[in-house]
């Protein structure tokens, strides 16, 4: 996708960029009712997730992460914007008359044909088990548990790589750099997720963040002592501690958050932090 640059006509467009989008008519049976941004508050109105609130109303698009229409060819009819994710989505018309949304693979265009199954070609947009893929294949929408649907490598520009197959397991390198084992019976989609340059987009104005449901982030050092451990002092005072902390007093940098005996630990060959 092309990134369009705004001319500096007004402060709101200063250094702003816009991703070129393809808009089209939406499938009514694939869209569920109002889907509001998370406000970050519980039933009592207490903030449980900071920096969230507001945002434009959204309609939820039902995405087919399972790709369980086996051996039925489908054609890409539209490439659409989805407000619920960074990646674009594309509408598929199958030969049996059914319509579904899938994540838009990079390089796929309107009119391309896709299919899922066990004996299909290695082509962008096709979905098949890892047993049928050659080593070095770039994939996305990867299952962790067979039949549960794709859970890994679904963000815009995400791509995983199949690097080895041995026994009942396949070794994959994930977008985070983590190398882990996954059952060879799990399915994945060939190719990379589209909308690769989304991380280079500049919103250009604070209001654009509010449309996305994101509230301002305030530094703890400018707060009062009652609000943050870093707060207080006269003028630009230091935080007054040896190490930075969260608003609740826990270490902010370097604290491990993953459980040591998590069930999936035995499947990880190399952690994403150890590269």
UniProtKB/Swiss-Prot annotation:
GO cellular component: mitochondrial large ribosomal subunit; plastid
Keywords: Plastid, Ribonucleoprotein, Ribosomal protein
Subunit description: Part of the 50S ribosomal subunit.
Chief localization: plastid
Protein name: Large ribosomal subunit protein uL2c
Heme is among the record's keywords: no
Lineage of origin: Eukaryota, Viridiplantae, Streptophyta, Embryophyta, Tracheophyta
SMART domains in the record: Ribosomal_L2, Ribosomal_L2_C
Pfam families xref list: Ribosomal_L2 (PF00181), Ribosomal_L2_C (PF03947)
Record localization: Plastid
GO molecular function: RNA binding; structural constituent of ribosome; transferase activity
GO biological process, one term: mitochondrial translation
Organism whose genome encodes this protein: Cuscuta reflexa
Similarity-based family: Belongs to the universal ribosomal protein uL2 family.
Ribosomal protein among keywords: yes
InterPro entries named among the record's database cross-references: NA-bd_OB-fold (IPR012340), Rib_uL2_dom2 (IPR014722), Ribosomal_uL2 (IPR002171), Ribosomal_uL2_bac/org-type (IPR005880), Ribosomal_uL2_C (IPR022669), Ribosomal_uL2_CS (IPR022671), Ribosomal_uL2_dom3 (IPR014726), Ribosomal_uL2_RNA-bd_dom (IPR022666)
Region (Disordered): 225-249
Disulphide bridges: none
Residue ranges of the TM segments: none
